[in-house]
Amino acid sequence: MRILLSNDDGVHSPGLVALYEGLKGLGELKVVAPDRDHSGASNALTLNRPLTVEQHPNGFRSVDGTPTDCVHLAVNGLFDTAFDRVVSGINTHANLGDDIIYSGTVAAATEGRHLGLPAIAVSLVNNGHFHYDTAARVVRLLLEYKQALKLGPRSILNVNVPDLPWERLSGFRVTRLGHRERAEGAVPMTCPRGKQRYWIGAAGQGGDAGPGTDFHAVREGYVSITPVHIDMTRHEALSGLREWVDGMDESTGGQP
């Protein structure tokens, strides 16, 4: 099994190193990750300049681009043989609910899916202890058993692991994405030259965080596993919207 590892925290992230160490012996591992932190980059793809790839003494490769760039280059240009899996992480913080829209960690997995590969995005629900070894062990277990899991080649699993020793985990839960409340306001500041600057405000708390959600699972000490797909169509709105458009056509005689 050939596994591509990437992330959004950068090629020197301790989470990425822990993931690599934890998956040794499971297959052929290749690491292609951003040369710096790209948290919150989402699915950004660099189209306005060429990208540079550098190989480090430990064999890891870095790209001066986004997580999506890294997976795209790795699958479509850097290596002669194909990959079987993409694993993105271990992210330093949780990717729960609406976080996945912004997450570069999930975006790297998403790019794998776009290129026809099953993918896992794994994040540590960090409380300051940094039990990356626990998260790496979770990923190894999932990869070992994923052969029997019939999700298809374009599947994505979003995995969030409580920041606990392995023996203190409550178990595993299959969950749906919860939802956060509105984000906190932007934080203004004045730079030394007197110009106004702003920091993006903190993410909102889990508003939809009850039983069955990823928020609830990790709060109870469970590993949260959420199957994610890319279709953003709001299917339940299609019928009503068609009726509205049909009525609009009738009132305008079919003219815009």
From Swiss-Prot:
Main subcellular localisation: cytoplasm
Gene Ontology cellular component annotations, sorted alphabetically: cytoplasm
One Pfam short name: SurE
InterPro entries documented for this protein: SurE, SurE-like_Pase/nucleotidase, SurE-like_sf
UniProt KW Hydrolase keyword: yes
Catalytic activity: a ribonucleoside 5'-phosphate + H2O = a ribonucleoside + phosphate
Enzyme Commission code: 3.1.3.5
Cofactor(s) required for function per UniProt: a divalent metal cation
Coiled coil: none
Cofactor note as given: Binds 1 divalent metal cation per subunit.
UniProt KW keywords: Cytoplasm, Hydrolase, Metal-binding, Nucleotide-binding
SUPFAM superfamilies xrefs: SurE-like
Binding-site residues for a divalent metal cation, renumbered to this chain: 8-9, 39, 91
Transmembrane parts of this sequence: none
Keyword flag Cytoplasm: yes
GO MF, one annotated term: exopolyphosphatase activity
Cell compartments where the protein resides: Cytoplasm
PANTHER family attached to this UniProt entry: 5'-NUCLEOTIDASE SURE, 5'_3'-NUCLEOTIDASE SURE
Family classification: Belongs to the SurE nucleotidase family.
Described function: Nucleotidase that shows phosphatase activity on nucleoside 5'-monophosphates.
Protein known as: 5'-nucleotidase SurE
Gene assigned in the entry: surE
